């Protein structure tokens, strides 16, 4: 599977999860407060008006990575993804060292073993896309 398909697939999966949460479902948590604490480390709304725009953003990013018809635009999209992931990775590493989060929370452990490693992996894939000629396929 090509790197850009992996990146797009992750964004489609994230879009689906956000749409799922917009229905009021709280899996993998037992309630919205627990979900918010586990996903974000603080209490925030998972109301449709909050999560549906995020779902739409992930769909737009997935389509842009797969279907953009300009190499320059493709590089800008992937560079934007990489920049966002770099910021999230940096924040995740800070939280991994216990700064700004309590090590007794679900968020701390999810961040340590899932969120930050996932961001590092996606960042590496995005950087690989920027370094290779795979994006030339997007112009065809």
What are these regions (language model features)?
Residues 52, 80, 104-122:
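Individual transmembrane alpha-helices with interfacial aromatic-anchor signatures
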């Amino acid at each position: 599977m090509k790197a850009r398909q992996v990146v797009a697939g992750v964004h489609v999966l994230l879009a689906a999860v956000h749409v799922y949460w917009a229905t009021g479902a709280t899996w993998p948590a037992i309630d919205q407060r627990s979900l918010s604490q586990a996903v974000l480390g603080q209490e925030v709304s998972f109301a449709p008006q909050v999560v549906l725009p995020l779902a739409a953003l992930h769909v737009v990013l997935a389509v842009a990575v797969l279907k953009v018809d300009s190499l320059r635009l493709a590089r800008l999209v992937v560079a934007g993804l990489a920049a966002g992931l770099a910021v999230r990775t940096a924040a995740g590493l800070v939280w991994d060292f216990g700064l700004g989060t309590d090590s007794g929370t679900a968020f701390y452990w999810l961040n340590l073993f899932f969120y930050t490693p996932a961001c590092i992996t996606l960042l590496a894939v995005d950087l690989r896309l920027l370094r290779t000629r795979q994006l030339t396929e997007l112009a065809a």
